[in-house]
Amino acid sequence: MRKSKAETAETRRRIVEVAAEAFRANGIHATGLADVMAAAGLSHGGFYRHFESKDQLVAEACEAGTVSILESLENAAGASVGAEGLRAVVDAYLSSAHRDAPGAGCPLAGMGSELARGDEGTRAAASRSVEALVTLLASRTGDPQEKANRSQAVFALSAMIGALTVARILNDPEASDALLSDVRQQIEAIAPIEPIEPI
């Protein structure tokens, strides 16, 4: 019996969701398509009915992971802007909860080095993720298109991704917590002193 378009779309969404978590938690190359399909409750043979390649799935999983982390950071910041808004985003990103849940975290921290070695479509998806996170950070400190705000946001995002990655590497929990705290403080030191008025 053929599936309806809605059922097919739901199956595809489920595959992307499972892959996004698995790729972030375990790495792209360590996660086989058979693993993804089994976790989604599907047979391995059905993969190519939905995707042309693993690379296509990686790109879509990166985009899905980005939507998820953006929602999480937006919820953490609420309506806060200026220094308070930037602080809320940075605190949520560089939290022990984010560090300890890589499968639900930022795809750039969870898959970054593998995304950099991906095909053109994968790197394009990752580039859109970078742009979305830079825009989020820049919008918390003023006009997201203003060069100074974007430069500050690029610096902050780069530091955040690096710090989260290193914090996950460290096997000493106290050192990992201290690293997250130190980088939070350094990023927050560059935030604007006076909050801006909401638009």
Q: How would you label these PLM feature ranges?
A:
Residues 1-10, 194-199:
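N-terminal intrinsically disordered/low-complexity leader segments
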Residues 60, 74-105:
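Hydrophobic alpha-helical connector segments
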Residues 14, 18-25, 72-75, 159-166:
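Solvent-exposed, amphipathic alpha-helical segments
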Residues 63-68:
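Short, basic, alpha-helical segments at the C-terminal edge of helix-turn-helix-like DNA-binding modules
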Residues 85-89, 99-127:
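Amphipathic alpha-helical segments used for helix-helix packing
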Residues 14, 18-56, 60:
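Helix-turn-helix
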Residues 119-128, 140-199:
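Hydrophobic/aromatic-rich alpha-helical bundle segments in the mid-to-C-terminal region
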Residues 17, 83-98, 154, 177, ...:
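Amphipathic alpha-helical segments that line or abut small-molecule/effector binding pockets
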